């Protein structure tokens, strides 16, 4: 069974979000199950030179894009037993950021065409083409509409994964007409047309044999207007080929027993070492070293989606408790400024790191007691899974993957691995935070809760089995 992942980003090459983590970890887990996965992505100039040096030029071809042929170098390399192909074209990929350019429609039209034009030259017979998010959605659409009559492509099945429905790849009609050479028959509401523009993600949904969302709850949510980003009707129409498979975490990266970034390695049987990480975190940020004061942390993009309006509304009320708070992330200036002001107002209780620091993030996960993630929506979420693996108890809103992975603690049965609230309401969140703090001070209960969190399986194994079953079903 041969699978080709078409992605716009992938760890360890380049990362802007969770898509890169999925693309980096899932193929390795599938390989353990006997599934051969190769990955194709752009050769961005942002990729570390050391990784590019590990690739060799496999072939040079031309990619037809509108009225012209564009250069396409196919670089080939291997990392952790997985084969990668990098699509080389400096005109499109020598940029200072992955996305957000005026010609993104052209860049990813080129990449979509390049993926398909490369397939006969890969020395790899593709059984299933698995595309991800808007950037590669048109790979599946073009395969069905323009390539599948060719014997080299006719057997290929397609899977399309929605990581975040909010970003759809909406561009002027000229992208469709001039670059992809698709005619008027594709510019209507049953095809690519979307409020007078062209929607790449819509193409992926329409044309793919199977669609997955990154959690079962998110799969249901996106079929409703509130979460559906104007594609809810289309997703209801194609509900029969839509499924939800929750993401995992790469346990070779996120594992407190082996993590080289943290001060003291530990497991569920050596939680005193977790306290050593807490003290190290307090020292790093210059917080008073109080063992019995819970540290509440957030490692997040500072955006509206992450529920920061709730946090902002009741933050001072949380500060009335005996707590310390650490925020690590960057994003919208209004939230950055708010947290910086709170750090100024509460210097003994609040510390903020604007930006991202991988090593520090690991230490925050290891050294905190509670992890706050009150998202407005969350397709899957990685932070709560990492927090659970490190015995840092998540406080989440019941949406998307947060609902699928965090079970609220039940004091009657002792079951659960975190705390959650349903409504997007600041005082519901506050009540849940206060409830978590209360249980934190009940040491036998808290220790049991931490052990329950740490002993669950958050690896990619279950997800990989579900994807293998999906691929197998397509090939039967």
UniProtKB/Swiss-Prot annotation:
Coiled coil: none annotated. Keywords: Glycogen biosynthesis, Glycosyltransferase, Transferase. One of its GO terms (molecular function) is alpha-1,4-glucan glucosyltransferase (ADP-glucose donor) activity. Pathway: Glycan biosynthesis; glycogen biosynthesis. It is an enzyme of class 2 (transferase). The keyword Cell membrane does not apply. ADP-alpha-D-glucose binds at residue 15. Its EC number is 2.4.1.21. One of its GO terms (biological process) is glycogen biosynthetic process. Belongs to the glycosyltransferase 1 family. Bacterial/plant glycogen synthase subfamily. NCBIfam families: glgA, PRK00654.1-1, PRK00654.1-2. PANTHER family: ALPHA AMYLASE DOMAIN-CONTAINING PROTEIN, GRANULE-BOUND STARCH SYNTHASE 1, CHLOROPLASTIC/AMYLOPLASTIC. This is Glycogen synthase. It comes from Bacillus cereus (strain ZK / E33L). The gene is glgA.
